[in-house]
Amino acid sequence: MSKTVRTLALGGLVLAGLSACVSVPRGQGSGAAVVDHVSDSARQAEAARQAWLQAHPHWSFQGRVAISKDRNGGSGRIDWQQDGPRYRVQLSAPVTRQSWVLTGDTTSGAGRLEGLEGGPRSGPDAEQVLLEATGWTIPVNQMPDWVRALRIAGAGAARVDLDAAGRPRTVQQDGWTIDFLAWTPASAEQPELPQRIEARSGEAKVRLLVDQWTVSP
């Protein structure tokens, strides 16, 4: 079997498994509108939020994700665990009981994908490993910052639109457009964090709905 055929077959198996799950529902509430002016107090609050998150690099979230490209796509559960630059992401399809685990390091960019027919795949570029195995285009090395709406303005973003609270509303970066559509409220343990995110680049689209955030002290 050629490498191209193997890649398409692996991608088809993963998409078939995830497609058995229900699609990601729309989160409650809508994203705040983009504004032309943000108050100084709102900017200070957002700066404090980002500083707090930068000081807490160990975190996790559980939720639902939908991934599509061209006419192919699927949805399932996602469990993301971040330990500084290292991450472990588990995608699972409860109906088919299939799961895939991607581990990597945002410093080196390398990654390893397990759960595929034929055994694990690894390489120096986690995004390329994922693309070759599944056909998905997902910016996994940027995701730890994107999912928390963290350090976006200082990371070479082409455009950042803010809402009245000073939080990112829409970001254009590295060929992707990221919309922050809903936020979890702040608590005594942690500040506001994104609840519903949509990211798109050409025909590729990722939708994420976070059910629970956990940030370690």
Swiss-Prot record:
Main location: membrane
PROSITE patterns in the cross-refs: PROKAR_LIPOPROTEIN (PS51257)
Membrane topology: Lipid-anchor
Gene3D superfamilies associated with the record: Lipoprotein localisation LolA/LolB/LppX
Cell compartments where the protein resides: Cell outer membrane
Keyword hit for Cytoplasm: no
Lipid-conjugated positions (N-palmitoyl cysteine): C21
GO terms for cellular component: cell outer membrane
Region ranges (Disordered): 105-124
GO biological process, one term: lipoprotein localization to outer membrane
A Pfam family matched in the record: LolB
Residues of the signal peptide: 1-20
Keywords for the protein's UniProt record, in alphabetical order: Cell outer membrane, Chaperone, Lipoprotein, Membrane, Palmitate, Protein transport, Signal, Transport
Domain of life: Bacteria
Residues anchoring lipid (S-diacylglycerol cysteine): C21
Record carries keyword Protein transport: yes
Matches recorded under NCBIfam families: lolB
Role noted for this protein: Plays a critical role in the incorporation of lipoproteins in the outer membrane after they are released by the LolA protein.
Subunit structure as annotated in this protein's UniProt entry: Monomer.
Family stated for the protein in its record: Belongs to the LolB family.
Descriptive protein name: Outer-membrane lipoprotein LolB
Organism placement in taxonomy: Bacteria, Pseudomonadati, Pseudomonadota, Gammaproteobacteria, Lysobacterales
